[in-house]
Design a protein with these regions (language model features):
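Glycine- and Gly-Pro-enriched alpha-helical subdomains that act as flexible
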Residues: 133, 137, 141-146, 159-177
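Long, charged alpha-helical interface segments
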Residues: 80-106, 110-116, 120-126, 163-181, ...
Length: 294
């Protein structure tokens, strides 16, 4: 098993040209797209469809009036002045997406970097959306199916590296490469990590035909030592240094500083850095929608 990492959005065009047919790509946009995606799914949404542009989201609404529109620009929910008359139902704060609002719904969410990263992976066997919130579940899935190649994809911020994405990729790389942790993943034991606020929640038993996923994918495989690229080692080293004061480290980064400066979004940073709150796999389907898969 070979593990590589894309740490900067500048690398995404090259990723899109790679042969990924035997690869699983894991996309991180911790603040906040992929954290919101897994929260939405945990709270009972049917699916979430990521798009890049406001116009794409509005086109979905015209075809399906019952969908919810989610998204932000500069951290703030999209309003009628930006769309020509339509207020979006939700922003990009995972705390907005309560069960009461999203259960049974399909959400179309406009997010620039997150969508760009997901689309760069469309040639992959499987594309997963991951965050700190569902990190161990994602690692357990990868260890079970033992793909030939894993690519950890950091969405970044605009054209820049995002500290929180690199740290999440490093944490997942550590889970997959550390033999003690890997053995625990193989047998389904909990993986030790810094304290968090909530206990694990059982996986929702659904399957929606995502990229390369099937029920037999969870057969237990022998744990083998993966081969790591330099970029994965870089992310692992960053994670090891930051993991015991994660909030403090991330709060100094660009994305977090922007959110912390907006009173109603201040708490999103700590929310998105909690580990293993949701025990689910979020997979991108061939139809462009992200759903829970087993």
């Amino acid at each position: 098993m070979k593990i590589d990492a894309i740490l900067s959005p500048a690398e995404l065009p090259a990723l899109a040209k790679r042969d990924l047919r035997n690869a699983i790509c894991v996309v991180f946009d911790v603040l906040r797209a992929t954290s919101t995606f897994v929260t939405v799914l945990h709270h009972g949404a049917k699916a979430i469809v990521p798009v890049s542009e406001i116009a794409e989201a509005l086109a979905f609404r015209q075809k399906q009036p019952d969908i919810l529109l989610g998204g932000e620009r500069d951290g703030v929910r999209i309003r009628a002045a930006q769309t020509g008359g339509v207020d979006f139902d939700l922003g990009n704060s995972p705390r907005e997406y309560t069960p009461e609002k999203v259960r049974g719904k399909t959400i179309v969410s406009t997010t620039t970097n997150g969508t760009r990263a997901l689309r760069a992976c469309t040639g992959a066997q499987t594309v997963l959306a991951a965050s700190f919130l569902n990190l161990t579940a994602t690692a357990q899935f990868l260890r079970r199916i033992q793909p030939a190649q894993i690519v950890l994809v950091c969405a970044g911020t605009r054209e820049n590296v995002a500290t929180e994405d690199v740290l999440a990729a490093g944490a997942l790389g550590e889970m997959l490469a550390n033999e003690t942790i890997a053995q625990n993943l193989k047998v389904g034991r909990a993986v030790p990590c810094p304290p968090r606020d909530e206990a694990n929640i059982p996986v929702q038993q659904q399957s929606h035909g995502a990229h390369g996923l099937s029920r037999h994918s969870h057969a237990t495989a022998e744990v083998s030592r993966p081969t790591l690229s330099d970029s994965v080692e870089t992310a692992r080293n960053a994670w090891r240094k930051a993991k015991f004061n994660l909030l403090e480290v991330v709060s100094e980064a660009e994305n977090a500083r922007r959110l912390l400066a907006i009173p109603e979004l201040h708490d999103d940073v700590a929310f998105c850095l909690r580990q293993d709150v949701y025990n689910l796999i979020a997979a991108l389907g061939r139809d462009g929608a992200i759903r829970i898969s087993i």
